[in-house]
Amino acid sequence: MATDTAQAENQMESRRDFLFIATGAVAVLGTAAVIWPLIDQMAPDAATIAAGAPLDIDIGSLAAGQQIIVKWRGHPIFIVNRPPDALKILQDPALVGLLSDPNSQARQQPGYAYNWHRSLQPEFAVLVGICTHLGCIPTYEPNRNQLAPGWLGGWFCACHGSKYDLAGRVFRNVPAPYNLPVPPYRFINDKTIRIGENPTGEKFELDSVIQL
């Protein structure tokens, strides 16, 4: 009986670890403002999570500017619905000039994410949420001037000050050497992303990136 109870508690912990959500100026991971959605159909069982199997994520209710974080193969995966103004900023020469690898020359993404938005569809960013310096988890800071005057939105790693834009491209003069990795993923339909599976005809493994 005690064993059954412990197993149930462990499974619940795994499900709670699977998905959380933050919006607007709410920082992710490490604040008391994290909101836990009650979306059972999006939470796989513990065995699925542990196996690292492909993971289907419903993005139908993901509002513009909102981020969700899911857990795949033990890694936090950032999924963000980038609004039109954020996409314009990604192409702004004033921002591009501040980035270390604006054209994604380093192999930190699959071929189908080798573009200015580093994604299959411009609106949706899908990134491994691990700082390429020492493995901390950056916080989502999407709003202009939210982090500091002149900030245009992106992620900030509080461990050592590394910064990334809303495409996961790393800024110059920070400790992190590479852009945030893009995991293998594809769209099942307009409202569902499958993480861990490439589009038809594409080949990419997360282990092939330079820095995870």
Question: PLM ranges: what are they?
Answer:
Residues 59, 72, 80-81, 128, ...:
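Pocket-edge structural micro-motifs
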Residues 2-5, 36-37, 41-54, 60, ...:
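Conserved C-terminal region and hinge/linker of Rieske [2Fe-2S] proteins, especially
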Residues 96-204, 208-211:
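Rieske [2Fe-2S] iron-sulfur-binding domain
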Residues 66-113:
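Extracytoplasmic/periplasmic/luminal assembly and interaction segments
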Residues 1-13:
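N-terminal secretory signal peptides
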Residues 12, 17, 21, 29-71, ...:
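C-terminal segment of N-terminal export signals and the immediately downstream linker at the start
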Residues 36, 72, 78, 164, ...:
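Aromatic side chains
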